[in-house]
Amino acid sequence: MDFNNIPLATIKSSDDKGKDFIVEMTTRPSETKKKVPFSEDMREIPSLPNEEEANATDPQANEVADENGEGFEAEKISSWIWVLSAVAGISGLLFGYDTGVISGALAVLGSDLGHVLSSGQKELITSATSFAALISATTSGWLADWVGRKRLLLCADAIFVIGSVIMAASRNVAMMVVGRFIVGYGIGLTSLIVPMYITELAPARLRGRLVIIYVVFITGGQLIAYSLNAAFEHVHQGWRIMFGIGAAPALGQLISLFWTPESPRYLLRHNHVEKVYKILSRIHPEAKPAEIAYKVSLIQEGVKVDFPEGNKFQHFFHSLKVLFTVPSNRRSLFIGCFLQWFQQFSGTNAIQYFSAIIFQSVGFKNSISVSIVVGATNFVFTIVAFMFIDRIGRRRILLCTSAVMIAGLALCAIAYHFLPADTTQNTNSGWQYVVLASIIIFLASYASGIGNIPWQQAELFPMEVRALGAGFSTAINWVGNLIISASFLTMMESITPTGTFALFAGFCFVGLVTSYFTYPELAGMSIENIHKLLEKGFWQAVKESTKRVRKGRIDEA
């Protein structure tokens, strides 16, 4: 990218005496318009050319005029961005560990909480986390804009530690439910904040993979939990150790976050321009100072448009109004909420939460150990998604894997139909292995597609409504999680396992059809271009975006 003919923004420089000043560029880096004393509290960056003016100057300028500036981001990217994403992704480890550890704990609790648990009490203990996460996900959107992404992550870690200690020390069902509720509140915060934080830091060409780091940690946490479930299965009250271990990664992340930056867009909203300049310079170590300054000013211009003057309550109600009245924002909200609905009503968390109980029901004697297969499948195929989501694209992966999910669930329903009524008397029917195989098929396709694509939701929304829109979408995730976790065992008893898994297959079919007509290909696009694409309507956006996909790779339109 040649920046010589593009009007540039301001950069920090020094005169012959070493005194810092700000240089406002005109058309070439060698030409200066004025010098003003440098202040650590830089408040303003001069106005920039609009996109038409930039394109008239340089045919490639549209790459820089976007919010994410793909031309600028073609520069070498520092490994630091991977470290930041990994530190934030530890929240996913907490999420996944809690999902997996409850499966093993429910199978070995026995009467340790005062009596043998009923199905309803197991559902209550499991769903308490989802209910709390729903509450926190609903409220954390506007909190993220008020206090920042990083501070909320710090709070979530402290909350998770407290909840883990309470669960480990539980003496009755009520105490366990309270601990699960507290942990759920922390998980709900991170399920919204982490994908948004990574999205706002990530270069466009790496955004999909960087966000999937969060999902990799989720599935990694589940695998660790299933392994520990097996290790402590025969340890007296080993479930207490299993719950207590969950506090360790939370403490590790809490300490690590003190060395990570706040989101650049949040910082610019609060006029911390110099901090953003330093962050982008570190992410793009080979970029020219003028390129960094231009990028900073582009983001700042977007923040100024997205957040007009006013107090916090005015901003909130303004964002709420814009989210529901602007057609492109409504489409973004529909896609975000729909994808989260699809993920939860596919039935995956029923399998994650109750895998040990499921495998017990079909006749596996060592059901907790068999559950490790569930965690391993989820983890391995999330890595597959990590490798290909920015190469093949979100839409193509989603459509293909959804069809395989339907086949896996249908096969599971059929296998349950032919299982003997009393699996304790006949454990060699062969159909139990068909159930296991079908669940592996389902989870492999789930982890490759709908298991991670909804967490890309922050890319759907412009800055003005990002936290709010992502908050609504995440809330739908936890509503679905709550419904499934609170009703799965009851469904298995009332409409039979065959009916339950057939119902999940039906939900997936609805998800596949809706995805085909409404979900465009977004890989490789800047956030600003995504917003422009969705202005054209669902089907037009789908048609235009699919033209960008050529021979298995993503080309920017």
Curated annotation (Swiss-Prot):
This is Myo-inositol transporter 2. It catalyses: myo-inositol(out) + H(+)(out) = myo-inositol(in) + H(+)(in). Keywords: Membrane, Transmembrane, Transmembrane helix, Transport. GO terms for biological process: myo-inositol import across plasma membrane. The chain crosses the membrane at residues 77-97, 100-120, 124-144, 158-178, 181-201, 210-230, 241-261, 368-388, 397-417, 433-453, 469-489, 499-519. One of its GO terms (molecular function) is myo-inositol:proton symporter activity. Transporter for myo-inositol. SUPFAM superfamilies: MFS general substrate transporter (SSF103473). Residues 30-44 have a biased composition (Basic and acidic residues). It is found in: Membrane. Residues 1-76, 121-123, 179-180, 231-240, 389-396, 454-468, 520-557 are cytoplasmic. PROSITE patterns: MFS, SUGAR_TRANSPORT_1. Coiled coil: none annotated. Residues 24-69 are annotated as: Disordered. PANTHER family: MYO-INOSITOL TRANSPORTER 2, PROTON MYO-INOSITOL COTRANSPORTER. It comes from Schizosaccharomyces pombe (strain 972 / ATCC 24843) (Fission yeast). InterPro entries: MFS_dom, MFS_sugar_transport-like, MFS_trans_sf, Myo-inositol_Transporter, Sugar/inositol_transpt, Sugar_transporter_CS. Belongs to the major facilitator superfamily. Sugar transporter (TC 2.A.1.1) family. One of its GO terms (cellular component) is endoplasmic reticulum.
